[in-house]
């Protein structure tokens, strides 16, 4: 296999992130709660859903922001796929913010002594965001390297 036909690490990480993200929507996040239902419950402070009760603002805000990271993930996916990331450093910051916001659920479960309630789907979902963060970091390094490194006389 030649160097041009082997997939780049960023491509592998990117497609792994996309696959993990997609799978997490169908995997159980909590007992009897697949990812897509957890998304709806997280948006319940804005758009009421089933039996989701009223929450204090200090729980409502991070839940809604965490739910919105799913939309951000899809936007980052589309931008990276289209190679339209004009500011790779901003891509890193946004991906990092998403990871940190999504850690809310882990911290909340730990605080309420309910870590055993978080199931495989949550960790796959979180891993998708961590993988996207790695893609963002590698892309930013590549952009920085190619924009500041002289290429005359060096092999590709």
Write out the residue ranges for each language-model feature.
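Compact integral membrane and secretory-pathway proteins
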Residues: 2-150, 156
């Amino acid at each position: 296999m030649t160097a041009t036909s082997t997939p780049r690490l960023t491509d592998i990480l990117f497609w792994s992130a996309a696959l993990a993200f997609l799978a997490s929507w169908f995997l159980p996040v909590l007992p009897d709660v697949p990812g897509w239902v957890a998304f709806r419950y997280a948006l319940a402070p804005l758009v009421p859903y089933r039996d989701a009760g009223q929450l204090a603002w200090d729980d409502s805000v991070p839940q809604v922001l965490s739910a919105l990271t799913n939309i951000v993930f899809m936007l980052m996916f589309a931008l990276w796929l289209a190679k339209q990331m004009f500011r790779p450093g901003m891509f890193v910051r946004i991906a990092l913010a998403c990871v940190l916001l999504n850690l809310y659920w882990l911290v909340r479960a730990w605080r309420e002594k309910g870590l055993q309630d978080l199931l495989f789907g949550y960790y796959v979902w979180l891993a998708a965001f961590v993988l996207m963060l790695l893609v963002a970091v590698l892309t930013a390094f590549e952009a920085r390297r190619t924009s500041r490194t002289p290429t005359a006389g060096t092999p590709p």
